[in-house]
Amino acid sequence: MLKLLSRVLIGAFVFGAVLLDSAPLSTAPALAARSSDAAGVRVVVTPKNLGPGVTVWEFEVVMDTHSNPLNENLIQVAALVDEAGRRYTPVAWQGDPPGGHHRKGVLQFLAPAGMPKSIELRMNGVGGADTRTFRWELK
């Protein structure tokens, strides 16, 4: 009885490993990070969760400076713009609060109803720069 049970468990383990190995990890290709260096502040943005079927789009944002504190509220100064000019405002910032010289977090937007061909993440006034624009082609 013990031999039969161990064979069943080993078989189940092997079957599960084969299924996991063949499952796709992601439905959308990874998009490259974009960066902006202006007014003594470096901002790097990496799309993390975009694509069809996703309800919330996520962008990892890293800001570094050695001059003035990073006091901007990213929910107020950021917007996502598609190729048709439609603007989407952030619904959440999960990360470091305003202040300091190094901030990191995830900026979240509700996903557009349809998949746009391209998007731009625009940030106004971060580190004293007018507008920083980060662009990605999606289709």
Question: PLM features: residue spans?
Answer:
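Low-complexity, acidic Ser/Thr/Pro/Gly-rich terminal tails and inter-domain linkers that flank the onset
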Residues: A30-G53, R86
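Short, surface-exposed alpha-helix to beta-strand junction/turn motifs within ectodomains of secreted
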Residues: N71-A84
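Short, surface-exposed binding/anchoring microloops in extracellular/periplasmic proteins
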Residues: V44-E72
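C-terminal segment of classical bacterial N-terminal signal peptides
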Residues: G16-S26
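Extracytoplasmic
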Residues: A38-G40, V54-E58, I75, H102-K104, ...
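Bacterial N-terminal signal peptides that target proteins for export
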Residues: M1-G16
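Solvent-exposed coil/turn segments that connect beta secondary-structure elements
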Residues: K48-L50, V62-H66, E83-G85, P112, ...
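Short, solvent-exposed, Trp/other aromatic-anchored flexible loops in extracytoplasmic proteins
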Residues: A84-R135
